[in-house]
Amino acid sequence: IYYHALRNYYEKDFTYIELGDGIELWENLFFNEVFEAHKNDFLLMRKFHLKNRLHMIWGNHDMTLKSEKKSTKLLDSYFDKITGTDKDLLKGLIFNEGIVLEPEGFNKNILLIHGHQADFYNYVWWKWSRFLVRVLWKPLQVVGIKDPTSPAKNFKELIKVERRLKKWILANNNQMVIAGHTHRPRFPEPNELPYFNDGSCVHPRSITGIEIVDLKISLIKWHIISKKDGTLQIVKSVLEEPRD
């Protein structure tokens, strides 16, 4: 689903901004394992990068990539097993903690972050949280025990993170924010604080995201449907349409 959606955006000349945790480096010790499992995705991202249409934000699960030395080592090139040579991948790609969009003709800037900045365990104590994920929570997930510190798996933590983000928005002149981290898609009503969340790309049957077209924001979902002839098709649905 992710590859199909990303290819669609590439063909339509979109710019892709990844809001963090795009590369799972907590549960996976070695990037090469991630690359081999998602090679087609990375090669498609390379096409975006070559056209200067790829921008990356680091989250808690790929926070090590905030180091340019680390991101260069992991992402600049890959080993092609067919030719037996190293080939360029995402050479020179920089990971940012946040990005500010300043659209022409729009009366407000838009702050893009992962969102773990409002999550003490996953921002300040991220190394400790990563250790626990690797040695404790990952094995326990096999028997159905979820990580209580993860907002994506603990509803109470999710609400706390959202509350902190909204408090920050209110304290900063209703700064518009688009975040991730919680895996819960959010799209505010006109009278609510301008907090958006793009949801998640890890669910097996659907992925969600935020689209900005002609200064208008939509919450969208790519998912699989079953057609009458028994075939499956990936389609895009608009969950929340732009509002004035």
What are the residue ranges of the model-derived segments?
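Extended recognition/assembly regions associated with phosphoester-bond processing machinery
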Residues: I1-D244
